[in-house]
Regions:
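Small/polar (Gly/Ser/Thr/Ala-rich) solvent-exposed segments
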Residues: 37, 60-80, 88, 101-127, ...
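Acidic, low-complexity, intrinsically disordered peripheral segments
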Residues: 406-455
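Amphipathic alpha-helical coiled-coil segments
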Residues: 38-53, 128, 132-152, 162, ...
């Protein structure tokens, strides 16, 4: 597709003091959407997993100090005399200790889990960012589509109102029937009920968009879709097999689950470490005075360094049980990844077909709407000539407005399929939002009418 210059795009989106373009809504959603803000905090927390895991491999340095005031009575007994001494004295102990793991398989496994969890947090946040783009477009398009449907109902209601006025005039002139009046009144009343329902749908859609953007919105300030020229489907650029390869490699949900699988794999290794020895370098510097009755009024200054070896012998079978449990959880994670992969590829195929067939669908509904409009005009002439009846006009108008409604839905669905195809493939980014925003412009702008959208 022709790339739309960003400078031009920003110029288009900035026109109108109170108007709101899709790019403006995106910037607001980045700051105010509660789900995305929560994802940001979740991502920040996940970034610490690697550091926490690495800490188990690094030196552990501790300092301790203990001071006491002691009062004691010492009685010495021998065969001749007994002496009793009373002592009031201060004592302290100061210890600086260092431990450096040299061989600790469990600590290494925990570190690898931390790395995997950090990568998993990155992929999950990437998915949340892409999901925000999808949710924003859905909320945006739902609001505009609801408004468009409401406008179609208003136009249909006006048409029925004019037809009702004509039926009444013909009835008074003796050329019409009461049946014609009642039929048109019934259609008019039905449209009124549908209009009330559609107004509720519009209010709900606007509320969803307001919740995402964090600001009060008026539907009339949103840039409408300017997809008046038939888009060209560029299905030859990338085949379904190429899209499948992209999804397997880049889909954020699959990437998240792959990192989760790595966490499960290292959990097996961490459990296995229960069978293995650990070796640590230990060093300490200790100062004490009058630490106990046995070294009263004596001061010690001791430095030591050495190796500490721990060899597990038997733990009641818990290590083997933990390994079996971790292995089962790993298989569970693998099965869940396989299931998610199949679901992702199925969704990818659906959106691929929706996008590539969307152009033909839009063209078909354009032709249907045009034919339906001609049918309305022809039916009116036939009724005037006595060849058709009033009900035929009502049915023809109903078909026309239904076709226009289906055409509007097809346009929004086509853009949504374009967006979801990229989301499922894992390639969706802010450049796509810029490109998508170019299709929503002030009504006076016609640039988008001459553009096509890349596959």
């Amino acid at each position: 597709m022709q790339r739309i210059a960003i400078i031009v795009l920003f110029g288009l989106l900035s026109s109108g003091a109170n108007a709101l373009g899709l790019l403006d809504a995106w910037e607001l959603a980045l700051r105010n959407d509660a789900q995305f803000r929560a994802a940001g905090f979740e991502h920040a927390a996940g970034q610490e997993e690697e550091t926490i895991g690495r800490a188990n491999l690094l030196p552990n340095l501790q300092y301790g100090y203990n001071a006491n005031r002691s009062h004691s009575k010492v009685t010495q007994t021998d065969s001749f005399t007994g002496n009793t001494l009373k002592r009031d004295y201060d004592s302290y102990t100061s210890t600086l200790s260092l431990r450096q793991p040299l061989l600790d398989y469990a600590a290494w496994a925990r570190y690898q889990q931390g790395v995997a969890r950090t990568l998993m947090a990155d992929q999950r946040f990437r998915d949340r960012s892409q999901d925000l783009m999808v949710r924003l477009y859905q909320a945006w398009s739902n609001a505009l589509l609801a408004q468009e449907k409401l406008q179609l109902l208003d136009a249909q209601q006006r048409a029925y109102q004019e037809q009702l006025a004509l039926n009444k005039r013909l009835l008074l002139a003796g050329e019409g029937t009461l049946t014609d009046v009642r039929e048109t009144e019934a259609r008019f009343t039905l449209i009124e009920a549908q209009r009330i329902e559609q107004q509720d749908n519009l209010d709900a859609a606007i509320t969803d968009l307001e919740n995402m953007t964090g600001t009060a919105l008026d539907i009339t300030t949103l840039y409408p879709m300017m997809l008046t020229q038939l888009p060209s489907a560029e299905s030859g650029k990338q085949t379904l097999a190429q899209w499948r390869d992209l999804a397997v490699q880049h889909n954020a949900k699959l990437a998240t689950q792959r990192e989760g699988l790595a966490v499960s794999r290292y959990e097996i290794e961490r459990s296995r470490a229960g069978h293995l020895p650990t070796l640590s370098l230990v060093a300490s510097s200790r100062n004490s005075r009058s630490e106990s009755e046995y070294n009263y009024n004596q001061k010690y200054d001791t430095q030591s360094v050495g190796l500490q070896l721990n060899v597990p012998l038997y733990a009641g079978g818990s290590v083997s049980a933990s390994m079996r449990q971790a292995a089962a959880e790993y298989q569970q994670s693998q099965a869940e990844l396989d299931d998610q992969t199949k679901k992702t590829l199925a969704e990818l195929k659906k959106y691929y077909n929706l996008y590539n067939n969307g152009s033909a669908k839009i063209k078909a509904w354009q032709m249907t709407a045009s034919s339906a409009q001609e049918a309305v005009n022809a039916t009116r002439l036939s009724v005037a000539g006595g060849e058709r009846i009033n009900l035929d006009i009502l049915l023809a108008e109903q078909d026309w407005y239904n076709a226009r409604r289906e055409l509007a839905e097809a346009k929004y669905s086509w853009l949504q399929a374009w967006l979801l195809l990229r989301y499922t493939a894992g390639t969706l980014n802010e450049k796509d939002i810029l490109e998508l925003a170019a299709w929503f412009q002030p009504a006076t702008t016609s640039l988008a009418n001459n553009k096509t959208i890349r596959q």
